[in-house]
Curated annotation (Swiss-Prot):
Modified residues (Phosphothreonine): 76
One of the Pfam families matching this protein, by short name: EF-hand_7
UniProt: Ca(2+) 2 binding residues: 128, 130, 132, 134, 139
Modified residues (Phosphoserine): 55, 80
Origin species: Homo sapiens (Human)
Family indicated by similarity: Belongs to the CREC family.
Main localization (coarse): endoplasmic reticulum
Protein name, as recorded: Reticulocalbin-1
Binding site for Ca(2+) 6: 293, 295, 297, 299, 304
Residues bound to Ca(2+) 5: 257, 259, 261, 263, 268
Domain EF-hand: 79-114, 115-150, 166-201, 203-238, 244-279, 280-315
Signal sequence annotation: 1-29
Miscellaneous section: This protein has four functional calcium-binding sites; potential sites II and VI have lost affinity for calcium.
Gene that specifies this protein: RCN1
């Protein structure tokens, strides 16, 4: 989640690859299946009932995606349970032998925050070229677009020309929004806001604006129903729409289009992708407690958690299983 020219073809390849990684809201291939825009990692958690307690495919895929859901397979069941037990002791803040929904929510939020800052740390050195522990806009621009800017002829007749031409001003606009003191240089906190704008209150207008720009194909400043559907689903000519598409059309009319004018403005887009009444960590914590609470006392013992260990290994409570492969002292 370094670009630039280290050799002609290698530089181009790295630039394109990292452009895809670090500007996910800009480059989007047309999907053939449903795509979720709502800014929350477990997009549909709480919107449809989980599978039975014998299968956690829904949990893993909702939290991770299909590929990352296999992370927990790195350890044997006994190793997973042993390490999960140590994590449970840390989640139980008051040491009363129970894990409450609130304690789980606090832990999940901590894991989320750590994941974001770890992600920034991994790419920091690629952009901080003068090693002053700050990243200027010029450093970022050269690392990201240097090859493109230095070799425009190679891109002139390609789709990449349009892509980079669109990305550069958008990245600059987002960088300036994250740069709170306006010095065109990002601290780690500011660069984190640049890479993960959905996590910062002062960046949410940028998230809304970029979403509008991505979906609004006719350029009228609104998202109509067809644009809303086209962002989620690539329709085959004369082909039938899946049932979920029909359901999304109903969602658009009944819940997205608040003023019933047939289109979404910025406020309605904000309400859609940044719902104020949804706490992702709270929803997941409640889900984990509900699925593991055998005696229905609305809190979990270590035994209840370990009995349902494979659900927790695949959830954000263990950073999708990654915490189980770390030394306990790292947590």
């Amino acid at each position: 989640m370094a670009r630039g020219g280290r050799g002609r073809r290698l530089g181009l390849a790295l630039g394109l690859l990292l452009a895809l990684v670090l500007a996910p809201r800009v480059l989007r291939a047309k999907p053939t299946v449903r795509k979720e825009r709502v800014v929350r990692p477990d997009s549909e958690l709480g919107e449809r009932p989980p599978e039975d307690n014998q299968s956690f495919q829904y949990d893993h895929e909702a939290f991770l995606g299909k590929e990352d859901s296999k992370t927990f397979d790195q350890l044997t069941p006994d190793e997973s349970k042993e390490r999960l037990g140590k994590i449970v002791d840390r989640i139980d803040n008051d040491g009363d032998g129970f894990v409450t929904t609130e304690e789980l929510k606090t832990w999940i939020k901590r894991v989320q925050k750590r994941y974001i800052f770890d992600n920034v740390a991994k790419v920091w050195k690629d952009y901080d070229r003068d090693k002053d522990d700050k990243i200027s806009w010029e450093e970022y621009k050269q690392a990201t677009y240097g090859y493109y800017l230095g070799n425009p002829a190679e891109f002139h007749d390609s789709s990449d020309h349009h892509t980079f031409k669109k990305m550069l001003p958008r990245d600059e606009r987002r960088f300036k929004a994250a740069d709170l003191n306006g010095d065109l240089t990002a601290t780690r906190e500011e660069f984190t806001a640049f890479l993960h704008p959905e996590e910062f209150e002062h960046m949410k207008e940028i998230v809304v604006l970029e979403t509008l720009e991505d979906i609004d194909k006719n350029g009228d400043g609104f998202v109509d129903q067809d644009e809303y559907i086209a962002d989620m689903f690539s329709h085959e000519e004369n082909g039938p729409e899946p049932d979920w598409v029909l359901s999304e059309r109903e969602q658009f009319n009944e819940f997205r289009d608040l003023n019933k004018d047939g289109k979404l403005d910025k406020d309605e887009i904000r309400h859609w992708i940044l719902p104020q009444d949804y706490d992702h960590a709270q929803a997941e914590a409640r889900h984990l407690v509900y699925e593991s609470d055998k005696n229905k006392d609305e809190k979990l013992t270590k035994e209840e958690i370990l009995e349902n260990w494979n659900m927790f290994v695949g959830s954000q409570a263990t950073n999708y299983g990654e915490d189980l492969t770390k030394n306990h002292d790292e947590l």
